[in-house]
């Protein structure tokens, strides 16, 4: 195995995909975050990177407007990458362990008002796709499903007699959700 940063990153993503069996979206996010690290540390020996270099990268990204949440997720990926390098590639230290991300004010998500929701759901169409979309909007609004969960639903997941839908959530957890009358 090469000690080139790109090879180490590819091996890490392979580890996440095939050994830890993380979801494809999670692996894609980790890969993107590791590419950012490699871009900022371009030309550096990953085994020799120290805490000040990681802090500098975080400061630069924060200065470019990345949110604390994005920086925290990114730093978590970097910590995991270095943890993997220590365990599988005999690196000596993790320069990311004591880095803290600048905190920002937490904002509540914007929710649709009842009027906005009614406007969204009160369209009339004889088109089959429009009927499907309306049912999806209604289910999404009334059930609290994640968008990824909604898009993965199959007709076989719907129990019309009981008025429920079987959802495969994060971590492969299955749950049964009641379906509102409108959906």
Regions found by a protein language model. Give the residues of each.
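Conserved catalytic core of the tyrosine transesterase superfamily
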Residues: 1-183
């Amino acid at each position: 195995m090469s000690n080139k940063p790109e090879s180490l990153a590819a091996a890490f993503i392979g580890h996440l995909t095939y050994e830890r069996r993380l979801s494809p979206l999670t692996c894609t996010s980790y890969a993107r975050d590791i590419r950012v690290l490699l871009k900022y540390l371009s030309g550096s020996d990953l085994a020799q990177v120290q805490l000040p270099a990681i802090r500098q990268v975080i400061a630069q990204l924060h200065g470019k407007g990345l949110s604390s949440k994005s920086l925290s997720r990114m730093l978590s990926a970097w910590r995991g990458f270095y943890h993997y390098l220590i365990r599988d590639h005999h690196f000596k230290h993790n320069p990311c362990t004591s880095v803290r991300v600048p905190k920002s004010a937490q904002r509540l998500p914007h929710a649709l008002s009842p009027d906005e929701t009614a406007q969204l759901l009160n369209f009339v169409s004889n088109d089959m796709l429009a009927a499907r979309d309306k049912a999806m909007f209604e289910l999404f609004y009334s059930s609290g499903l994640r968008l990824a969960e909604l898009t993965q639903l199959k007709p076989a997941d719907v129990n019309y007699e009981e008025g429920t839908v079987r959802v495969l959530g994060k971590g492969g957890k299955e749950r049964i959700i009641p379906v509102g009358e409108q959906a």
